[in-house]
Amino acid sequence: MADVEQVQVRFFTKQKKYEIADTPFSLSANIGHGDLNDLINGLLGAGNVGQSIQFDFLIDSQYLQDTIQKHMKAKEISAESVVEIEYLEKHPAPQPDNILVHDDWVSSVSRCKNCIITGSYDNCVQIWDDQGSCLAKVKGHTSPVKDVEWVSKDEQKGVFLSSSQDQSIRVMEWSIGSGEASCVHVCKGHTQSVDSISINPSATKFCSGSWDKTLKLWSAVVNPEGGDEGENGSLSKKQKTTGVKKKATTRTPLMTFTGHTQAVSSVVWMDRTTICSAGWDHCIRLWDAESGVNKQTLTGSKVFCEIAYSALNQCLASGSADKYIRLWDHRAEDGQVVRGILTSHQGWVSSVSWSPSNQFELASASYDTTVKIWDTRSPYTPLYTLTGHQDKVMCVRWSSSRHLMSGGTDNQLILY
């Protein structure tokens, strides 16, 4: 595309309160974000009623980072056409709202309703409320806790999982208001550290990934008798008839998935029948949760630290040791399964988490001490870089559509 002085543009937005007339404009091709922002504010009359509104702009679903002309040349957009420019309000960067101090590194975090659980290298799980008060500190593991996950929570009790370098997963039951949580089942079967756990959509089963190179499938159902549940998923006859409650009974896996050749670093339940795993063997694998068959393998070039799946866009995101975040579409029929690469981190990308309400929004955590929030339509520039941590960030999760949680080796969980 040759350089042009003027372009025809039409503005539109999906935010009804900021709609303007559907009228084409003839604009200089050399204007960028700032001039467009002034133009939209002028058309809305916002500049006359206090502080102007900040907007972002997209052309063909890609963020405008430069002038209109440079964007059109890069994307090979014809100068003869009317350029459709979408604008949307730019929200201010999230700010730290609270800091929850731990005794050791914070490896993992999970939120359910108004309660947060964290896993730490002090071998403990802690339960917190939204205001940052510690409701319970749960001991039991003999090595650092690597992952935590809520199973369920109601007015009376909460059930959650914790996995550890001690090779076990504990199914815990918390009596709300008592400050106490008891271990109902200890899940044993892995022979090395259990680094990742994920619950299925119906909260009846969960999977685990370990440094022993395997995934295992387990029952997440808490037996009232506290009895041992094994491969057949049933209680012993004696336990059924006597009704004797036995705490912390051993639970064995329902199934073992083999195929990874190095440590399994991350597992996620994609839907009712599909589990996804990633590992240090540079592979992402999709498994049939019923049969244990490895349905598909996606190959990368570096160690995978964590994967996340979005039901909104049906895509996977991966964080890797090469500092990059990759977006994967396992359904791609053209063979191009990598749909995008997000570049900005300066260290290992240790954790990734999709927004629960926005199919384009992704959070990432890195050993470079930062948390970043991305719109996947802007692969080279994150929306925000959050710099509250003083050391490596090990985990990040959305607690709601507009709130984040991150934990790291500075012994802090930061709520944004």
UniProtKB/Swiss-Prot annotation:
Q: Which Pfam families match?
A: NLE, WD40
Q: Region Ubiquitin-like (UBL) domain: which residues?
A: 7-89
Q: Which UniProt keywords apply?
A: Nucleus, Repeat, Ribosome biogenesis, rRNA processing, WD repeat
UniProt-listed SMART domains: WD40
- Where found? Nucleus, Nucleolus; Nucleus, Nucleoplasm
Domain of life, per lineage: Eukaryota
Query: Would the keyword Kinase be found if you checked this record's keyword annotation?
Result: no
Listed PROSITE patterns: WD_REPEATS_1, WD_REPEATS_2, WD_REPEATS_REGION
Q: Which family does it belong to?
A: Belongs to the WD repeat WDR12/YTM1 family.
PANTHER family in alphabetical order? RIBOSOME BIOGENESIS PROTEIN WDR12, WD40 REPEAT PROTEIN 12, 37
Q: What does this protein do?
A: Required for maturation of ribosomal RNAs and formation of the large ribosomal subunit.
- By what name is this protein known? Ribosome biogenesis protein WDR12 homolog
